[in-house]
């Protein structure tokens, strides 16, 4: 089975890595593909696509993952056609809860199943309407977001506890996110 982890990765953080690791441990995944959205249709990005690809390659270097740039604007377009074969699209509980608002969620599930990482002590997202096309697995993940990482960089604060060390080094080396403001990466309510 192929596991697919998609996102803007602006920047990738420890939560993304924990999600990938938990999926690899809990599910019969023999191939993990990390799709870095080049031009996502659901949100603005701060760093350019090639930079985010580099950051994701650094973040997932310790895992058996293939990190690639995805030119599709929406998840449905990336998975349509079934070219990933038997596949699950891996998301955390927050994205799982937002799944019904994604562009063509039923079409996404025609081609892949949704694998939702849920945290102990938190209610799982209500996705029962999708039946066996949605599976869940236990996730022990740090509470971190890309917004939090960018805000810390903007404030001149260290991010070594939020992102893998090579990502922190690349952010510093490239001078990323220093001019970040919340409005620079606002989310469109119609996502993925």
Map each language-model feature to its residues:
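Nucleotidyltransferase catalytic core that binds NTPs
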Residues: 1-192
